Design a protein with these regions (language model features):
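Membrane-embedded beta-strand positions of outer-membrane beta-barrel proteins
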Residues: 206-208, 227, 239-243, 269-273, ...
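Repeated loop/turn-to-beta-strand initiation elements of outer-membrane beta-barrel proteins
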Residues: 204-206, 233-239, 265-271, 306-311, ...
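Periplasmic polypeptide-binding modules associated with outer-membrane biogenesis and secretion
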Residues: 32-214, 244-253, 394, 413-414
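Residues that define the transmembrane beta-barrel architecture of outer-membrane proteins
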Residues: 190, 219-223, 251-253, 291-295, ...
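C-terminal outer-membrane beta-barrel translocator/porin domains of Gram-negative envelope proteins
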Residues: 323-483, 522-527, 537-541
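Outer-membrane beta-barrel "beta-signal"
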Residues: 227, 297, 502-504, 509, ...
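Transmembrane beta-barrel wall of Gram-negative outer-membrane proteins
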Residues: 250-351
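Transmembrane beta-strand segments that form the barrel wall of outer-membrane beta-barrel proteins
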Residues: 181, 204-214, 225, 236-247, ...
Length: 543
């Protein structure tokens, strides 16, 4: 969304020039005699009629209580007693318009109507901007988007903050939607015309990928395919389905379905479900199989959609069921059925600044235990020694993007603190492409600890066959802590790596990511101290 407030600047300049011309025509004696001192300054809403009496001196407000603030009153009062010259008038009008631009009234304009100022009285009027015309192009459902502006259109003055929030919500309601707002003055004083150009995401998108992020138990090579449908049931919803597994789908296969909808009261509801089955690679006659499933609900309440900080509060619930710990374990494998039932609350905030962009996410997860048949300490401790069904987890994520000349530094820090031993799916993962690179996927887990990932990206350059190449330097580290270590189990593990990355984006929405890292510090016995690993991901963004 891109708004162009220069409309008000052009309108302000036009009215100011007209005001100065009006003063020169209505008070010709000012050019021949000394200008009178300013004795009375009236700042009025343009819709208020000029009072019949002219009694009283000093600064007076008519119908503008939101502007009658001490700082502005003090600024305008300094002109009282000063010669009433065109320069004085222009300074007063400029001060008022600057104040309007900094408040919710940036579509309102201060100007000077025709009047006789020979007696030292000046009347400045504020014309409130009102949304008189709205034209929408490119939208799949223009009527639905038009209804979002009902609260800011009509004869009422435009609330600039409310209008900005409406424009931001139009984009937020449907992932992938982008809109651009252009404002222009209407034919009547105060009239504002809004042209909104909307670029909708494709109705149907296909995608596919291949990588080596699989578990050693089921094979590291993985393939996936996905389908995304926008505007499935309405103008602001999105549904998705993705399947993945090993290339033969004989050892690992899983699916994930999602649905998100922007609600009429400007909240976001998300539903997710997943399931999968695993056939571990075991020497005969051993056989190891398992399955898992999960459902989650998220309800996001945007708090500030515009401004220096944008933030939101998200409430949710997760249910996870598994009869194995094959994929989330560096402890002995078990096949005990467990149910996880947990509530979570998350606060996220983002702020761009002159040096980059910062994002903060704080999440509290609480499991009361006893919500399902296998949501108890017996099932949990049978899967992992010391695990309890009742727990609390606090996680804090800090992300920072900082341009450094031609380079770009992207950094992410995750902190986690748990109240007890957790099942593997809730632990902090310390190895793999999305964790400490250079280590095998799921090389280490911790109930608490920290994870720090860094990329220093060089400028992109043109490569062969139309590819765009972006090289980078990688530096990752983590500390994983076990809440209650078992005999022979290390209470802390440290992991660190450094390496090189290369992203190649090509025609046809193909992208290839190569990330090679060498281990600097390894607290995982199965991962040699100075070993290395190449992480590969090939993705097709689809039609």
């Amino acid at each position: 969304m891109n708004s162009l407030p220069s409309f008000s600047e052009r309108h302000q300049l036009r009215l100011t020039l007209m005001a100065l011309l009006s003063l020169s025509l209505n008070a010709p004696t000012l050019a021949q005699t000394a200008p009178p001192p300013l004795r009375r300054l009236i700042v009025a809403d343009a819709s208020h009629a000029m009072p019949a009496n002219h009694e009283g001196l000093g600064l007076q407000w008519q119908g503008l209580p939101e502007l009658d603030r001490p700082a502005l009153r003090s600024l305008l009062s300094t002109a009282l007693g000063q010669p009433l010259t065109p320069a004085t008038v222009q300074a007063l009008v400029t001060a008022l318009n600057s104040e309007l631009a900094a408040t919710r009234e940036r579509f309102s304009v201060a100007s000077v109507p025709d009047q006789d100022v020979s007696q030292g009285q000046l009347r400045i009027v504020v014309t409130r901007g009102r949304l008189a015309a709205l034209r929408i192009s490119g939208a799949a459902d223009a009527d639905a988007i038009s209804r979002q502006f009902d609260a800011v259109r009509g004869d009422a003055a435009i609330d600039a903050a409310a209008l900005d929030t409406t424009l931001a919500w139009i984009d937020r309601a449907l992932p992938g939607r982008n809109s651009e707002a252009r404002f222009s003055p209407g034919a009547q004083p105060g009239a504002v015309a809004l042209d909104l150009q909307v670029k909708e995401p494709d109705r149907l998108t296909l995608s596919a990928g291949a990588d080596n992020t699989g578990s050693p138990v089921t094979g590291t090579r993985r393939v996936s395919a996905g389908l995304t449908i926008n505007r499935l049931l309405g103008s602001n919803d999105q549904a998705g389905l993705r399947i993945s597994g090993d290339p033969s789908f004989g050892h690992s296969r899983s699916w994930q379905a999602s649905y998100q909808v922007g609600l009429p009261w400007r909240h976001v509801l998300s539903l997710n479900a997943n399931g999968g089955s695993i056939h571990g690679r075991m020497p005969e006659p051993l056989d190891l199989r398992g399955s898992s499933s999960g459902q989650s609900l998220r309800y996001e309440i945007p708090l500030r959609l515009t401004g220096p900080w944008t933030d939101s509060l998200t409430l949710g619930f997760d249910h996870k069921r598994s009869d194995n710990n094959l994929l989330f374990s560096d402890t002995p494998v078990t096949q005990t059925v467990t149910d996880i039932g947990q509530f979570n609350a998350s606060y996220g905030a983002e702020r761009p600044d002159a040096l980059g962009r910062t994002r903060i996410t704080a999440t509290l997860t609480v499991s009361p235990g006893g919500l399902f048949g296998h949501n108890d300490d017996d099932a949990f401790s049978a899967t992992r020694a010391g695990a309890q069904a009742r727990y609390q987890v606090v996680q804090l994520q800090l992300e920072r993007g900082t341009p450094l000349g031609a380079l770009h530094w992207q950094s992410q820090l995750t902190l986690q603190q748990a109240s007890t031993n957790l099942l593997g799916s809730e632990q902090l993962n310390g190895g793999g492409m999305s964790s400490v690179r250079g280590f095998a996927e799921g090389a280490g887990y911790g109930d608490s600890g920290w994870l720090w990932r860094n990329e220093l990206r060089a400028p992109s350059s043109a490569g062969p066959a139309g590819l765009v190449l972006t090289p980078s330097l990688l530096l990752d580290a983590a500390q994983l802590r076990v809440h209650s270590a078992q005999p022979g189990e290390p209470a802390r593990r440290h992991l660190a790596s450094a390496g090189l990355g290369l992203t190649a984006s090509g025609p046809g929405k193909l992208s290839l990511s190569l990330q090679w890292a060498q281990r600097i510090k390894s607290g995982v016995p199965s991962q040699a101290q100075h070993g290395s690993r190449l992480h590969v991901s090939l993705q097709w963004a689809g039609l």
